[in-house]
Each structure stands twice: as structure tokens, then as C-alpha cells.
Amino acid sequence: MTWLVPRYGTFSALTNISLGGDPAVAGNAFGQGSTWFSVLYHGEGTGTRSPVPPGYTGVAVLKFAAFQNGTDGLLDAVSGGLPGWVQAVQYDPESWDFTPPIEKGAWLYNPHPRVSHAELFCRKAHELGLAVVLSPSLDLCNNKPNPAYPGAKPQYPVAPGERNYEAYVRHRLASAARWLRPGDVYEFQSQALETDAARYRSVTAAVEAQVRDLSHGVTFLAGIGRTKANWDGATAAQLTAAARGVAPLVAGYWPNVDENATRVRTMIRFLQDLGY
């Protein structure tokens, strides 16, 4: 099983006994050496600490919300020097201020800037000898004005009656996997669908097919669990049903949980249900 685990968030919450966390369960799940531990870059330069917890082995991932934004994008970090522990870098563009508008609209190749930022990110990372994790958010598909483009038009619009995950599939955002190499990771943020196991599976299957058709040897992961801002009240049983439904399609999961006792206990029970 491959896991993609945020060090300061998911891991710290799941090992916090006061919140109902269980270090033994977390160790059983994430201590097998196949976990990719991540930390979001905030411009700390070479002083950024490795996300791999003491006593664990795994892949150390430095996560970015931008390719370049002048402060804490991948190119900004490279210009200041990457920490020596970095083994992989993650590109996590979302509909938030951390990702520049130009990048939100050019995840795939866009004729206006004449680039794909997913491609630029992968090329730079591979040039540096680093593995890559691509994890574009579903909310890149939206109808918000984008000031970086002519007429402020959204570049991945959602059609009337369509959901953003349907637009994600229609716009083929997962086709960015063409720029990944064997051993890299593509993660689908499927957690928005987790309370409906059938839908979770069908949409994840559509995304996995896009990844498989255009790449070779790429590790495909699915998101599971949500934090306060978007919490859906999912039970451990619902998370387990969703995860088991896509087990033939995925190599593992990106579990999301914040420091909330209800959500922590739910995620621990989910891990126990999976045998940890």
C-alpha cells in the first residue's frame, strides 16, 4: 500500500492521543517504508524540515501550490536552494490565492500563455533528479472569472447542470500524467465523492483510465477524508466502502484529516477497518 501523508496535519493528528489518535495504528499503516510524507513549502528555503517523522522511512516530499509565484513556488525554491532531503516534489494547484491565476488556467497546455504548467513543473523536477506528485484539485474546474486570460474567462468551465468532478473528467485534467515518469505519482482528489461509494468508484475509474492511457509505471492514488472547511460527515464505514470499491484501481490513498477529535477517530477506525 502506498500512502501520501501530510506530515503536519494528517500524520500529527492521527498520532495525537488527546484527539483519539493512535500511534500504533498510524505506525502500522504508514511505517512500511512506502509512504510519501509531504510538507507544504512556505518560502523557508533550505531550513525547511524533512516531513519524514523520526523512526519512519519513506519518500520525503516538498509540496508546492505553484510552479512560480515569486515567493514559494517550485522555481522560487530552486533559486534559493532546495533542502538536501528532498526526494520528490508535489504540484497541488487549487482555486486559492497560493496558485497564480495564470497557472490555474494552464494546468494543461493553453494557447494564451503557450505553456502547460504541469509540464513545466514535471520537466524542472525531472531535470533536478526528483520524483513528481501531481494532484490538481477538482476546483480548478469552475466558472470564476480568471483575470489572467482574455475577457477574464474561466479556462476549465463547469457546464450547466455539471459538477466540478464531471468537468475534471471532461477537460481531461488527468491527461497531465503524460509528463510523469515511471515511479512518479498521480493523485486524484476524490474525497469529495467519498460518501457515495458507487460514484467514488465510477469517477475514480474514469480518471484512472486517463492516467493509464497516457503514462507508464505511474502510481495512482485516491484522496480519502476531508477537513473542517469541506467536511461531509463521512463515517468510517463510508470511507471503508469507498476505499474498498476502488482498491483494484489504486495503489493507495491520500488521507486527509485535521486536528478534530471526531474526524481523527473516524480516520483511525477507517485504518483499522483496512487491517491496520
Located regions from the model:
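Glycan-processing catalytic domains of CAZymes
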Residues: 1-276
